[in-house]
Regions:
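Acidic donor-binding loop of glycosyltransferase active sites
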Residues: 179, 278, 293-307, 318-321
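Conserved catalytic-core segment of nucleotide-activated headgroup transferases in glycan assembly
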Residues: 203-294
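N-terminal subdomain of nucleotide-sugar transferases
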Residues: 1-61, 250
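Short hydrophobic beta-strand element within catalytic cores of glycosyltransferases
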Residues: 311-314, 321-325
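A short, well-ordered alpha-helix in the C-terminal region of glycosyltransferases
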Residues: 355, 362-377, 383-389, 393
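Acceptor-binding helix/loop patch of EC 2.4 sugar-transfer enzymes
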Residues: 8, 71-87, 132-169
């Protein structure tokens, strides 16, 4: 099976949830015997060693293109009847460039990751006349709506709510044109069923490489909280600022030695300014395994988002109990006994974290339960097998 996979970014190294999802689909499809060509947008310099490693699984086609929300793009979008999220991912000139890059190449299936790549996939189908599939890592318009709800008023609110409404309209129309759709949560699955009962839907959730992501023997810090995330997304930053300003002070009153470790590339100054004995903004690390092995609790104070937080799944695979908002934990059908504890305000975060810190046996048991939950429900082999088998059916 010759698969053209469309991605809005080069997904290596696998340093954030978005990249992890795309990279593992690419690798797992190749492992199942497919000839995969990964076509991606990029405007940065890629480490050639990392690129060579990616080429061990398939072919790479780079399209020089930036998807940054520049001031010029944002200004133009104020008067545009197409949402900026889709406008920046597709244009006629971009399409012509893609066609020139795949000229004389043969494909059986087009696989698109994220609705950002939906328009490109649909237009390629018109030329290549082959089936198209879309993996919905999230329902994008929901994220914009939740952001608007958080803002509530002002010019920024008016801009975001308009973009959300436009995106909902466009995204729903694009979704209906695919031969198969792969939602990653039950919430998204039900939404799509209600959108159009005739849609071909196959649940294919996120996953974890449980052989690679597992704890190592290292001394635990019973007072250490940790989060690993991408700081390119403003909602992750806002959630952490809220946690540091609202939750950490009340935790420090009871446990002065409490410590929050921040892992991830490009930590902004708005978070680095909190560096202290209680906040350690480490930044990018080659391997997150030692840090997750040392910490005792993973946190996810996210108030805007959709889809699944892959970093939460990885933390659970590392035998870490997780304290998260309902939105942060969305799409993960785990209970408290499975190691996923819900907290939606500062007092709930405080209570859940203190409960785990003060009861070592409970914390350890929740951690073991969390890993078992991931092994039984969230592996890449399970998820990508569903995608692979769905494509085989389309080609019969």
């Amino acid at each position: 099976m010759r698969i053209l996979q469309l991605s809005q970014q080069f997904p290596f190294p696998e340093i954030d949830g978005g990249k992890i999802g795309i990279a593992n689909i690419y690798k797992e499809l190749a492992k199942k015997g497919s000839e995969v060509t990964l076509l991606y947008y990029n405007d940065t310099i890629i480490d050639q060693k990392i690129k060579k490693e990616a080429e061990n699984y398939g072919n790479l086609i780079e399209i020089k293109h930036s998807i940054k929300n520049t001031k010029f793009r944002i200004l133009k979008s104020i008067f545009d009847n197409k949402p900026i999220y889709l406008r920046k991912h597709f244009s006629n000139s971009l399409f012509k460039n893609v066609l020139s890059q795949i000229k004389n190449k043969k494909f059986d299936i087009i696989h698109a990751d994220h609705s950002a790549m939906a328009e490109l996939a649909i237009n390629l189908k018109k030329i290549l006349n082959i089936p198209i599939g879309l993996r919905l890592h999230n329902i994008e318009w929901k994220i914009w709506y939740r952001y608007a709800e958080e803002l509530q008023s002002g010019f920024k609110y008016k801009y975001i709510i308009r973009q959300a409404r436009l995106l909902k309209k466009f995204e729903e129309e694009l979704i209906k044109q695919f031969d198969v759709l792969f939602p990653i949560t039950n919430i998204d699955l039900e939404y799509l069923k209600n959108l159009d009962p005739k849609l071909n839907l196959v649940m294919a959730s996120a996953g974890v490489d449980v052989e690679k992501v597992k704890p190592i023997k290292i001394e635990k810090n019973p007072f250490e909280l940790i989060i690993a995330t991408t700081y390119r997304w403003i909602h992750n930053i806002n959630g952490l600022i809220w946690f540091i300003e609202k939750v950490l002070p009340i935790l420090k009153k009871e446990i002065p030695q409490i410590k929050l470790t921040l892992i991830g590339k490009d930590i902004p100054d708005s978070l680095r300014k909190f560096q202290s004995k209680n906040v350690d903004a480490i930044g990018f690390v080659d391997s997150i395994i030692p840090y997750l092995s040392r910490a005792s609790i993973y946190i996810s104070p996210l108030f805007v988002g959709a889809g699944i937080r892959i970093k939460i799944l990885e933390a659970m695979a590392m035998e870490l109990p997780v304290v998260s908002t309902s939105i942060g934990a969305e799409g993960i059908p785990a209970t408290e006994n499975d190691g996923l504890l819900i907290a939606n305000n500062e007092y709930e975060f405080k209570e859940q974290i203190l409960k785990l810190i003060k009861n070592q046996n409970l914390r350890i048991q929740y951690g073991k339960n969390a890993r078992n939950f991931i092994i039984n429900n969230f592996t890449w082999d399970i998820s990508v097998s569903k995608i692979y088998e769905s494509y085989k059916k389309l080609l019969k």
